[in-house]
């Protein structure tokens, strides 16, 4: 297995985006074609990692001087700890398996303190808290929480505070579910899926929720929650204080899907957003936009990930769009210095 590499993009290339506000209403194909024609493709600086750990580096989280990378397809452990920003390997945790304390399918990871993280296992419907996420320490599982059965298919999450987690609602009854981090109990549900066909939502709510599968991110101050759709060009911003909702529909349109005879929502349009991170000033997203029919034609040549980096204000205005020199799946944005991007492998 070849050594994994991380793609780093110097942030000074991005800060010039302020003042160029516009709505993103053109297709992803047009964006990439225009960038290539003008020679405006953003090239990254490679940071090699002296290890062959990764098969599919999917998410990166950073806290102080340490970084944790989630590898979806690792045979032994899902999570790997590195020093930051030099990326020296420290330890691995989150053993893959079906035994007690092991994970069947890791969905995401969030820091809950300087050396503490929460992780989500969709396969078991459980959340685990680990301590010792630092150089020279051994990660230790501190908590094992069984999520409420009404939170079925928990595919992403973020932490509202030390006691509450938000998870996209896969039942279709609402947009979000809120659960206790001490008991796993469902506390409440909020918002509605903003599908353009309300009748479809009433008739096939679970299928709509699957078609509108979303990734979520809180702002650092927890004042806004942002969601982006995996199979459509839709970004939504929710104010926690005022309950104000801003919805932005891009040029590739809302999620397209078919309802199967069994009631499942089968994606039928495009693969769109891969990741979202909200910072103090902006919303950063990685976007693909390729049609499934075109992906099928690529067969083994298909590379997962998006090449479009969008930067938006907290009000949803797109201030800058960059095209990257390779497809990537996950980002970590440090607005003071670097953007670190985990690059997936086939």
Please report, for each region that a protein language model flagged, where it lies by residue:
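A short helix->beta-strand "capping" segment at the edge of beta-propeller domains
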Residues: 28-54
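Short, conserved, GDST-rich strand-edge loop motifs in beta-rich repeat architectures
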Residues: 285-303
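Conserved blade-ending motifs and adjacent loop-strand segments that build the rim/top face
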Residues: 253-262, 317-334
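Blade-loop segments of beta-propeller domains
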Residues: 88-116, 122, 145-146, 325-328
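Residue-level detector of conserved catalytic or cofactor/ligand-binding positions
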Residues: 336-345
């Amino acid at each position: 297995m070849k050594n994994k590499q991380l793609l780093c993009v110097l942030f000074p290339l991005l800060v010039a985006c302020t003042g160029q506000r516009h709505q993103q209403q053109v297709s992803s194909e047009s964006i990439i074609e225009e960038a290539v024609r003008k020679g405006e493709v953003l090239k990254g600086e490679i940071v090699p990692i002296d290890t062959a750990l990764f098969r599919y580096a999917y998410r990166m989280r950073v806290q102080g001087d340490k970084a944790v990378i989630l590898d979806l397809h690792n045979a032994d452990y899902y999570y790997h700890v590195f020093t930051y920003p030099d990326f020296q390997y420290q330890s691995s945790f989150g053993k893959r398996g079906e035994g007690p304390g092991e994970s069947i399918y890791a969905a995401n990871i969030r820091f809950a303190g300087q050396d503490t993280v929460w992780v989500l296992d969709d396969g078991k419907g459980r959340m685990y808290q680990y301590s010792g996420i630092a150089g020279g320490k051994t990660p230790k599982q501190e908590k094992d929480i069984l999520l409420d059965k009404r939170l079925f298919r928990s595919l992403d999450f973020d932490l509202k505070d030390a006691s509450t987690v938000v998870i996209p609602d896969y039942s279709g009854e609402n947009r979000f579910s809120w659960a206790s981090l001490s008991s796993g109990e469902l506390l409440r549900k909020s918002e509605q899926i903003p599908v353009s066909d309300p009748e479809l939502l009433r008739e096939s709510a679970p299928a709509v929720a699957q078609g509108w599968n979303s990734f979520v991110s809180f702002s650092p101050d927890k004042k806004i929650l942002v969601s982006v759709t995996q199979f459509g060009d839709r970004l939504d911003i929710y104010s926690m204080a005022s309950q104000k909702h801003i919805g932005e529909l891009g040029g590739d349109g809302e999620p397209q899907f078919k309802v199967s005879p069994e009631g499942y929502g089968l994606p039928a349009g495009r693969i769109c957003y891969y990741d979202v991170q909200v910072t103090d000033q902006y919303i950063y997203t990685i976007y693909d936009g390729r049609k499934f029919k075109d992906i099928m034609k690529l067969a083994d040549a298909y590379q997962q990930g998006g090449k479009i980096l969008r930067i938006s204000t907290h009000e949803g205005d797109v201030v800058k769009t960059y095209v990257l020199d390779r497809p990537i799946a996950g980002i970590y944005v440090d607005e003071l210095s670097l953007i670190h991007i985990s690059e997936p492998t086939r």
